C-alpha cells in the first residue's frame, strides 16, 4: 500500500469494474437549484425525490454474485449549475464494526469506504476517481487507459460521512471544474460505484451506470 490509497489495489479494482458486467445499467438524475448542505443527512427535498441506484454485486471475492439485503447499497445523484452531487446509503447490520480510522488526506488506513469513478465522455478512456472513507477521509486519483493511475492528482471537492444505526452515509459534491466532459447541452456520463467492506470478508462491491444530465445548457463558469 502506498500513501495514495494503493495504486496496485486501484488497478485491480479497475479491471474488475470493467469486466464484471457487459451490460451497463442506467439511472436518471435531475437538476437541483436547492442549496445542498454536504452534511451526510440527505434531507433536502431534491434527495428525497431522486431515483435510487441499487443492484450492486460482489467484485471480490465472488465476482458477480448478488449482495445480501443486509449489506445493500443505495446511491442517488443530483446535479446543479456547477457540480454533481452523490448521496450513498451503505447498509451494515453491525454499524459498530464499521472501520473508520482517522488518517491524513489521500490515505485509506483501515477504513470502509465508498467511491465513484466518473468518465465524462463515457468512452472508457479516462476516469476521475473520488473515494470517501467512513471517517470522511478523502482520496482522489486520475486514471487513463494509456497511463494508468495518477496518484499525484488532487482536486478540490467536498464530502461528509456519518455512521448511522443502519450503516453509514456518504455525501459528495464534485465541482465540474474537477472533471472533463464535452461542451454540449445533453451529457451522458459513464459511472462506476465502488464500496469496500473490510469487516464483511473484505468484499468489494460495484455497479456500472450511465447517467444523462439534461438540460445542461451553458457550460458553467468556474
Describe the role of every protein-language-model region.
Residues 1-25:
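Bacterial Sec-dependent N-terminal signal peptides
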Residues 20-222:
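Structural preference for beta-rich elements and adjacent junctions enriched in aromatics
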Amino acid at each position: 500500500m502506498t500513501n495514495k490509497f494503493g495504486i496496485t489495489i486501484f488497478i485491480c479494482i479497475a479491471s474488475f469494474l470493467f469486466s464484471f458486467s457487459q451490460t451497463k445499467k442506467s439511472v436518471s438524475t435531475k437538476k437541483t437549484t436547492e442549496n445542498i448542505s454536504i452534511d451526510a443527512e440527505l434531507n433536502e427535498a431534491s434527495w428525497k425525490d431522486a431515483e435510487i441506484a441499487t443492484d450492486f454485486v460482489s467484485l471480490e471475492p465472488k465476482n458477480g454474485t448478488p449482495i445480501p439485503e443486509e449489506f445493500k447499497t443505495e446511491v442517488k445523484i443530483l446535479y446543479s449549475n456547477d457540480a454533481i452531487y452523490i448521496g450513498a446509503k451503505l447498509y451494515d447490520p453491525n454499524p459498530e464494526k464499521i472501520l473508520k480510522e482517522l488518517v491524513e488526506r489521500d490515505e485509506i488506513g483501515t477504513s470502509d469506504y465508498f467511491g465513484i469513478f466518473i468518465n465524462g465522455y463515457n468512452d472508457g478512456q479516462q476516469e476521475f476517481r473520488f473515494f470517501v472513507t467512513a471517517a470522511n477521509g478523502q482520496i482522489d486519483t486520475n486514471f487513463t487507459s494509456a497511463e494508468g493511475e495518477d496518484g499525484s492528482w488532487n482536486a478540490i471537492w467536498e464530502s461528509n460521512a456519518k455512521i448511522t444505526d443502519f450503516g453509514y452515509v456518504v455525501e459528495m459534491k464534485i465541482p465540474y471544474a474537477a472533471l472533463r466532459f464535452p461542451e454540449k447541452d445533453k451529457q451522458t456520463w459513464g459511472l462506476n460505484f465502488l464500496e469496500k467492506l473490510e469487516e464483511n470478508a473484505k468484499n468489494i462491491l460495484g455497479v456500472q451506470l450511465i447517467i444523462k444530465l439534461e438540460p445542461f445548457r451553458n457550460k458553467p463558469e468556474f
